[in-house]
Amino acid sequence: MTINPVSRKVAWLRVVTLAIAAFIFNTTEFVPVGLLSDIAESFHMQTAQVGIMLTIYAWVVAVMSLPFMLLTSQMERRKLLICLFVLFIASHVLSFLAWNFTVLVISRIGIAFAHAIFWSITASLAIRLAPAGKRAQALSLIATGTALAMVLGLPIGRVVGQYFGWRTTFFAIGMGALITLLCLIKLLPKLPSEHSGSLKSLPLLFRRPALMSLYVLTVVVVTAHYTAYSYIEPFVQNVAGLSANFATVLLLILGGAGIIGSLVFGKLGNRHASSLVSIAIALLVICLLLLLPAANSEAHLAILSIFWGIAIMVIGLGMQVKVLALAPDATDVAMALFSGIFNIGIGAGALVGNQVSLHWSMSAIGYIGAIPACAALVWAVLIFRKWPVTLEEQPH
């Protein structure tokens, strides 16, 4: 099934709107990282206790990505996007109104349901909507939306939370989603489901050792990153003893470096994805090991955050490119699995960071995160030597 030919301008406008949607979805996933202290104060809880919200959100996405993708596999994609945006917006209104922590968690579960479906279909939709021969650029644009969520979304969300309250941050995200929904309704054609795969494609994917090895690498390296990243805001304030404003600046630097990582991968990723990902994981190991030693200086933390941000963006993009290359016949199923596995890593990392902070010391989150990062580095070198693969640009 093909989409009726449209002008390149309209095609790019559709992809840009999807990228904006990616920005909004990733902003709401990441923004609690910058608001943990404020939410904890609001509900008279410890920061580490509130942090369990990150794990719940991520694991709901992980568990529901594949079931929701299969349940909606035959649903027309434009209608599906509209439905999940309505759920997303309503859940943000509930976040804004949340009268206790339990209600806030329930609202986040609603958002996670929408997230689970959105990220399982977005990459394949971007490829379908892009101008002919521009699939890699379309994916890069979606990745840019993801990066901007860390560069702009998370820090702006934190600033709004600081000055107007964390509830206003969630309300603003909901309103941004409403505007994006109206644009999607206006711009998108009917998009019959295609290449979505089904349960029948699962055994086929599971019989691909390169893909399974990549999924293992994903969960380990993401766990490593989020062990430290989930608690970077309270770490900066409580361990490093630096200001709340500097915590905001650090999040901005970390996200901004992600844009650099995206540009680097855009230039070299098609030909050197394996090498780039391996180097980025090695860089992540170094950054995690140096997190506590760097905490004695704003400058040291800022420099470390630049390399950390570049590393994690290259890792994320590299994984996505490789998954798409290894499962071109079942992109939605493969990406649903990838999204689920990625979020298992987010939830596991946030939980490890939570337990270290509660029962040991928040100062150790970098060292603890470096342990799975080292394991990921060894695994990456082994599997990329055995199964080197790249995503070739193909006209469609």
Swiss-Prot record:
It is a multi-pass membrane protein. GO terms for molecular function: carbohydrate transmembrane transporter activity. GO terms for cellular component: plasma membrane. The chain crosses the membrane at residues 15-35, 50-70, 81-101, 103-123, 136-156, 169-189, 209-229, 246-266, 275-295, 301-321, 333-353, 364-384. It is found in: Cell inner membrane. Signal peptide: none annotated. It comes from the Bacteria. InterPro entries: MFS (IPR011701), MFS_dom (IPR020846), MFS_Efflux_Transporters (IPR050189), MFS_trans_sf (IPR036259), Sugar_effux_transptr_put (IPR023495). Pfam families: MFS_1. Keywords: Cell inner membrane, Cell membrane, Membrane, Sugar transport, Transmembrane, Transmembrane helix, Transport. Belongs to the major facilitator superfamily. SotB (TC 2.A.1.2) family. Involved in the efflux of sugars. The physiological role may be the reduction of the intracellular concentration of toxic sugars or sugar metabolites. This is Probable sugar efflux transporter. The lineage of its organism: Bacteria, Pseudomonadati, Pseudomonadota, Gammaproteobacteria, Enterobacterales. The gene is sotB.
